[in-house]
């Protein structure tokens, strides 16, 4: 019996030892060390002011990262080699080399050192101080977009805020840069003077197309937003009993992570709703908040879909940043924490605990890495992670960027294959529902070789405004370009679905750069033989009379004639228009070389050489204007001489807009807008010649693009203007006709009188003398 008890006791003592297998494999990175050297670090060695360690990874350049602790390290190979502590040149004269904040902005690293911002170009190894900041700052914030080659994406990476945390929000000095931090300018926001509380930070929430100000008041915090419709209210308040570090998860999904030593919060909608992170064991909730776990958080790491937490109690927590909620599970306790340790995701489901190691013989630090395979760890039955219900989730739109212009629609498809017997529910969401609306339909789409059912998901996207299902107070302004991220995930997805990433795509609701307008030119002047295309290509030029043009576009006569070289390579052969028939061009919309539609939106024309020998068929009154319409004269005066062709969708206001209250003082002025709801046309003066027109689509509801082009028209059929006024010509012709009639009547009457006979004889004798004289001249007399 005693032997049996000893065996049982031994078994119970051995079980924990067997189950406590190491969480990770430890390896030490040591490179470039052969012979001992004296420590030589150029410049002032930087250090991080916080007692905690941080690691900032570049979201686009995965091998680039910055370690912030008692030493600072910048790596270009994810710490796969020994590194010398990061330093700043003494020539920068930073004083105390204390770093309070850092941010990767595209191809540069921004550091706040001793309350000033410095820019380090890590590719060129060049330091410079930012300009434009006149007050002390403590933090910089920004985001990065990884879709290279897109101008809209580049704007995201270039945008940076600099600020001092802790001032009253109404008096805080905030600076903004759109040049990756090289140049800053003072940032102003409407109604900021009305806000109450301490300033906790400012962030560009690109996935929501908003700028958010964090307000802290009496241990509670909330976000204030910059633009309609969120600028009329605040985000829901959340606990803020101590300063929280804010981490913006990569991917533009609006995920924010707030953490301190004792708290961890997550927002999936750019701060509108901030929630505590639950701690689970299987399907059971252990704690509704990590605060109740009574741990001290040391390091937090996140990628697009995952979250990891390391505590000073040697606890490692892992969770997914799901579409519905976020929760953590705790792995087995092991000796993995140290004061210098920090967490770092290297790939999906791959986590490393990084610790720098000082070398007494070399200035360069080595790095110890403890690598964890999350998927392998979750297979431990004690974790009760469950089985992933989905075998496959894929879509052609994953990690791509699309553009939706006004009146456009985008169709996306995805494929889901569940495990046999499982019925998972796919969820589609957008980060900015105020701008982008969606409609999703799921249907069966055949079977796999194993007999599993394939499900096809069809997603339709277009502006929320055009769906017609949302209240106008909910939708963002249709005139403002916005951005949104679409995410396809599985509802209540098990934490074991590590490799089953949500499918995301970035949607720019703005200008489609593939669009352009073309003027229809089926019946050109060359086609009808009016102009010779060979002559037009042979350095052709023409003269514009000084009475017909104004170089200042004000309708005043010029002082001299103008010779114009015709750019045939750009314009081709001109359109043909008869001067006496009201005319307007046929404008076509093309995209990627394909015809889309005939443009019916409002547009304006302006002759590029200043010709003013044309007008319009409608006036402000006959066009039905309720307000004084804009015209080229007023637009040009507002723009100045530097931008004569500046009438576009940004500054156009329709005279039919009920919100436009400019009084209609001059109802008889020409109405200079073509297209739209009117039948307005161009009326040419009695003048033949070439007109080169600039055309601009000004309708703000047609496209976010500045759709502009130039084209030429040849006006024909006009007779030359008479020297005398037509009234005088008519009077003279009438008088000559009446005189001819009177002479035709009077001459026969006079020939039968005595005076008439004498006159007739006079003319006969005169004729005979002239005849005789002419004969003598020819030598016949």
UniProtKB/Swiss-Prot annotation:
Q: What does this protein do?
A: Auxiliary component of the CatSper complex, a complex involved in sperm cell hyperactivation. Sperm cell hyperactivation is needed for sperm motility which is essential late in the preparation of sperm for fertilization. Required for CATSPER1 stability before intraflagellar transport and/or incorporation of the CatSper complex channel into the flagellar membrane.
Location(s) in or outside the cell: Cell projection, Cilium, Flagellum membrane
**Annotated glycosylation sites:** 231, 294, 458, 473, 539, 631
Instruction: Please give a single GO biological process term from the UniProt record.
Output: flagellated sperm motility
Subunit text: Component of the CatSper complex or CatSpermasome composed of the core pore-forming members CATSPER1, CATSPER2, CATSPER3 and CATSPER4 as well as auxiliary members CATSPERB, CATSPERG, CATSPERD, CATSPERE, CATSPERZ, C2CD6/CATSPERT, TMEM249, TMEM262 and EFCAB9. HSPA1 may be an additional auxiliary complex member. The core complex members CATSPER1, CATSPER2, CATSPER3 and CATSPER4 form a heterotetrameric channel.
What phylogenetic lineage does the species belong to? Eukaryota, Metazoa, Chordata, Craniata, Vertebrata
Q: What transmembrane ranges does the database entry give?
A: 726-749
**GO CC terms of this entry:** CatSper complex; sperm principal piece
Q: Which UniProt keywords apply?
A: Cell membrane, Cell projection, Cilium, Developmental protein, Differentiation, Disulfide bond, Flagellum, Glycoprotein, Membrane, Signal, Spermatogenesis, Transmembrane, Transmembrane helix
Main location class: membrane
Source taxon at top rank: Eukaryota
Sequence ranges on the Extracellular membrane side: 21-725
This chain belongs to the protein called: Cation channel sperm-associated auxiliary subunit delta
Give ranges for the Cytoplasmic compartment: 750-781
Q: Topology with regard to the membrane?
A: Single-pass type I membrane protein
Signal sequence residues: 1-20
**Which family would the database say this protein is a member of?**
Belongs to the CATSPERD family.
Keyword Glycoprotein applies? yes
Q: Name one Pfam family in it.
A: CATSPERD-E_C
């Amino acid at each position: 019996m005693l032997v049996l008890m000893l065996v049982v006791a031994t078994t119970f003592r051995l079980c924990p030892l067997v189950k406590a297998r190491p969480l990770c494999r430890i390896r030490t990175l040591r490179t470039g060390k052969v012979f001992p050297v004296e420590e030589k670090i150029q410049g002032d060695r930087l250090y991080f002011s916080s007692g905690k360690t941080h690691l900032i990874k570049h979201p686009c350049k995965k091998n680039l990262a910055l370690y912030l602790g008692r030493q600072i390290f910048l790596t270009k190979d994810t710490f796969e080699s020994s590194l010398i502590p990061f330093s700043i040149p003494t020539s920068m004269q930073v004083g105390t080399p204390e770093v309070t904040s850092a941010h990767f902005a595209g191809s540069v690293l921004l550091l706040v050192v001793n309350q000033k911002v410095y820019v380090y170009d890590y590719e060129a190894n060049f330091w410079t101080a930012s300009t434009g900041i006149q007050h002390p700052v403590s933090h910089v914030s920004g985001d990065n977009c990884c879709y290279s080659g897109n101008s809209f994406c580049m704007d995201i990476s270039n945008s940076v805020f600099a600020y001092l945390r802790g001032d009253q929000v109404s008096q805080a000095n905030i600076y903004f840069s759109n040049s990756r931090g090289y140049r800053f300018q003072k940032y102003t926001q409407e109604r900021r003077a009305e806000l109450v509380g301490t300033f906790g930070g400012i962030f560009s929430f690109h996935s929501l197309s908003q700028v958010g100000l964090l307000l802290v008041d009496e241990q509670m915090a909330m976000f204030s937003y910059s633009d309609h419709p969120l600028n009329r209210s605040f985000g829901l308040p959340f606990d803020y009993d101590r300063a929280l570090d804010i981490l913006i998860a990569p991917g533009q999904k609006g995920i924010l992570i707030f953490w301190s030593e004792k708290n961890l919060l997550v927002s999936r909608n750019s701060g509108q709703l901030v929630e505590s992170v639950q701690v689970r064991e299987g399907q059971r909730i252990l704690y509704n908040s990590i605060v109740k776990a009574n741990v001290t958080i040391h390091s937090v790491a996140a990628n697009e879909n995952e979250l990891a937490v390391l505590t000073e109690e040697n606890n490692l927590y892992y969770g997914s940043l799901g579409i519905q909620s976020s929760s953590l599970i705790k792995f087995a306790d092991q000796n993995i924490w140290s004061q210098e340790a920090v967490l770092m995701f290297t790939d999906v489901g791959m986590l490393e605990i990084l610790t720098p190691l000082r070398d007494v013989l070399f200035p360069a630090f080595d790095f110890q890495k403890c690598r964890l395979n999350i998927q392998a760890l979750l297979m431990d039955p004690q974790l009760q992670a469950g089985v992933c219900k989905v075998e496959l989730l894929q879509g052609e739109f994953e990690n791509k960027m699309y553009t939706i212009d006004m009146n456009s629609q985008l169709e996306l498809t995805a494929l889901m294959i569940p495990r046999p017997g499982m019925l998972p529910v796919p969820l589609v969401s957008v980060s900015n529902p105020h701008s982008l609306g969606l409609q999703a339909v799921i249907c069966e789409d055949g079977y796999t070789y194993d007999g599993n059912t394939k499900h096809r998901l069809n997603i339709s996207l277009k502006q929320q405004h055009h769906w017609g299902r949302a209240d106008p107070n909910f939708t963002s302004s249709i005139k403002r370009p916005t951005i949104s991220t679409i995410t396809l995930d599985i509802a209540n997805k098990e934490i074991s679905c590590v490799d089953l990433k949500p499918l995301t795509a970035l949607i720019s609701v703005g200008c489609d750069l593939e669009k352009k307008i073309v003027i229809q030119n089926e019946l050109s002047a060359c086609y009808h033989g009016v102009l010779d295309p060979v002559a037009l290509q042979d350095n052709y030029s023409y003269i514009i009379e000084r009475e017909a043009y104004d170089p200042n576009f004000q309708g005043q006569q010029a002082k001299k004639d103008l010779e114009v070289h015709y750019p045939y390579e750009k314009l081709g052969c001109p359109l043909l228009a008869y001067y006496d028939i009201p005319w307007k061009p046929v404008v076509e919309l093309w995209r990627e070389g394909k015809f889309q539609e005939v443009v019916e939106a409002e547009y304006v024309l302006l002759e590029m050489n200043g010709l003013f020998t044309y007008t319009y068929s409608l006036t402000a009154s006959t066009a039905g204007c309720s307000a004084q319409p804009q015209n080229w004269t007023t637009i040009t005066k507002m723009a100045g001489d530097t931008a004569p062709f500046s009438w576009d969708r940004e500054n156009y206001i329709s005279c039919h807009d009920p919100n436009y209250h400019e009084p209609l003082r001059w109802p008889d002025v020409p109405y200079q807008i073509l297209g739209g709801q009117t039948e307005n046309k161009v009326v040419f003066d009695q003048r033949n010649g070439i007109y080169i027109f600039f055309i601009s689509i000004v309708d703000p509801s047609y496209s976010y693009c500045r759709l502009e082009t130039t084209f030429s028209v040849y006006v024909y059929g006009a007779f030359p203007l008479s020297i005398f006024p037509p009234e005088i010509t008519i009077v003279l012709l009438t008088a000559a006709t009446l005189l001819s009639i009177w002479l035709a009547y009077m001459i026969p009457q006079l020939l039968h009188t005595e005076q008439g006979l004498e006159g007739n004889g006079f003319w006969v004798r005169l004729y005979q003398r002239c005849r005789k004289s002419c004969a003598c001249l020819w030598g016949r007399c």
